[in-house]
Amino acid sequence: MPDKPTKEKLMEQLKGGIIVSCQALPGEPLYSETGGIMPLLAKAAQEAGAVGIRANSVRDIKEIQAITDLPIIGIIKKDYPPQEPFITATMAEVDQLAALNIAVIAMDCTKRDRHDGLDIASFIRQVKEKYPNQLLMADISTFDEGLVAHQAGIDFVGTTLSGYTPYSRQEAGPDVALIEALCKAGIAVIAEGKIHSPEEAKKINDLGVAGIVVGGAITRPKEIAERFIEALKS
């Protein structure tokens, strides 16, 4: 397992590259109760030249760590109904991820009501106080959410949840306007969400982002096949 990188070192490693999100949830074709599938996707991503991996769950992350030294952005998806945030939504999930010695922990930093009752700035401060050497990424959906997270001391702001909150911009593709605005504000942006093509990734890279995460367009074969099939129907 490699040493945990500094923010500067990680930004050097991520610059101009693609972070591949290797995830599958129950009910999806590539999900397996016994595991073993996500590390194969991560291995393929590494062989293609990916600069990092985004992964969900302690099991998947451990399996991926066993086959690659690429930096990992780790999350734990767990529902806390009736509240909507489910990506590393409480300190309990942060604790589990921190124990894995991964490069970055990503967490929901939207303004939606949280299970723990905290506002997002307070949650970020608590995590930073408990794990001062851990790099953190805020999954947000709007510029204001990104600004709040940045001002609270988050290391990276990800556009992961744009279009997935009812009040954010609803785009079929990536929220380029949000990515550009955050970059212009001097925030270290990890662009993520609905990036479907190499052309979109290139356009986003030219905005000066710190990193780019691509998931479904690479690691969800059902979604990829559906895109081809729908194109022939139109």
Curated annotation (Swiss-Prot):
What processes does the entry annotate via GO biological process terms?
Answer: carbohydrate metabolic process; N-acetylmannosamine catabolic process; N-acetylneuraminate catabolic process
Keyword Disulfide bond applies? no
Recorded GO molecular functions are: N-acylglucosamine-6-phosphate 2-epimerase activity
The EC number(s) given in the record are 5.1.3.9
A GO cellular component annotated for this chain's UniProt record is: cytosol
Entries under InterPro entries matching the protein:
Aldolase_TIM (IPR013785), NanE (IPR007260), RibuloseP-bd_barrel (IPR011060)
Q: Which Pfam families match?
A: NanE
Q: Which transformation does this protein catalyse, written as a reaction?
A: an N-acyl-D-glucosamine 6-phosphate = an N-acyl-D-mannosamine 6-phosphate
Q: Which UniProt keywords apply?
A: Carbohydrate metabolism, Isomerase
- Per UniProt, the enzyme's principal EC class comes to isomerase
Kindly give the CDD domains that the UniProt entry links to this protein: NanE (cd04729)
Q: In which pathway does it act?
A: Amino-sugar metabolism; N-acetylneuraminate degradation; D-fructose 6-phosphate from N-acetylneuraminate: step 3/5
Q: Which domain of life is it from?
A: Bacteria
Q: What does this protein do?
A: Converts N-acetylmannosamine-6-phosphate (ManNAc-6-P) to N-acetylglucosamine-6-phosphate (GlcNAc-6-P).
Per the similarity annotation, which family is this? Belongs to the NanE family.
Q: Write down what this protein is called.
A: Putative N-acetylmannosamine-6-phosphate 2-epimerase
Q: What is the lineage of its organism?
A: Bacteria, Bacillati, Bacillota, Bacilli, Lactobacillales
